[in-house]
Amino acid sequence: MPKGRRGSQSPTMSQRPAPPLYFPSLYDRGISSSPLSDFNIWKKLFVPLKAGGAPAGGAPAAGGRSLPQGPSAPAPPPPPGLGPPSERPCPPPWPSGLASIPYEPLRFFYSPPSGPEAAASPLAPGPMTSRLASASHPEELCELEIRIKELELLTITGDGFDSQRYKFLKALKDEKLQGLKTRQPGKKSASLS
């Protein structure tokens, strides 16, 4: 008897609930009253694209099909912030009386531009050339340190160690550091005078 109960319960136990539908308008074509009703949600979502210059409802879409649209339906207004400046319903993002602040997130990482702006500053010609000349030294030092660390890792892993190359790279690094240190005081005295 217990076997019969298990057998009768197994069909109900094997029925699992349907997985959730994340985009219901793509799956409910059989349930909807008309095939166009599930397309309406997508028209609402892509209003900004139509307002931004994408083809209107009468023009062919990317797939070559035209979007179904009623002949008497006026185009919905663009969302706030889109459309011609004269028709924008929201105010400008920054009050006109205040100074404009340009958005330059990477300004910290680049040097001042050369040209009329750089020519206007009195320190532009001399320091720019010396700054560019010294900019390669940290890169070279970094490269040397990477190679030295690679040799040290080879020693640790036991894959082989070239002592001559290690000594050469160390001496080269020390030489570059000395050259950089001797230039630094010269730069400071030149900039003060």
UniProtKB/Swiss-Prot annotation:
Residues 71-95 have a biased composition (Pro residues). This is Uncharacterized protein C11orf91 homolog. PANTHER family: SIMILAR TO RIKEN CDNA A930018P22. It comes from Bos taurus (Bovine). InterPro entries: C11orf91-like. Residues 1-21, 53-96, 114-136 are annotated as: Disordered. Residues 53-70, 116-127 have a biased composition (Low complexity).
